[in-house]
């Protein structure tokens, strides 16, 4: 994977940048030493990104916009003649992520609130690595062993944390702080145009 970034603007409270990238991903799936051609992929994509981060008081907000397009470079597989519902190696995918972090103090205690909303949209049927996934600790928590994937969808994560430094000296070499976190997450997957529902 190759990625180059150009800072468009920077000052004491904000930074704006654009990025260009190129990635190549190859997967090989086998059953009893036999390669499954229809489940093995060679995908190359170009990536265009825009990022803006800004400090607002003691908080910080960050916006990422992205466009990814499947192309035929670096030995990527051809477009072929996909049937209805088959993944397309020449896809267009758009993504957006907005995050906010706000530390604060209340009654002399340290708290922080963070929120992240992210989503992607594609009118094409995507291969599995390009699809958005819900479930697990990195998206919608509470569904560790269950996941949903789709070509288009998104999720919203929220977390409120309380932290306190360890004051007992013998414990500090192993534990610097402890705390409690409350989280609320929600997500949605849109069925692709070849599926009902």
Task: Identify the function of each model-found stretch.
Residues 193-197:
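C-terminal beta-signal and terminal closure region of outer-membrane beta-barrel proteins
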Residues 12-33, 47:
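Polar, glycine-rich mid-to-C-terminal structural blocks
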Residues 28-192:
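C-terminal outer-membrane beta-barrel translocator/porin domains of Gram-negative envelope proteins
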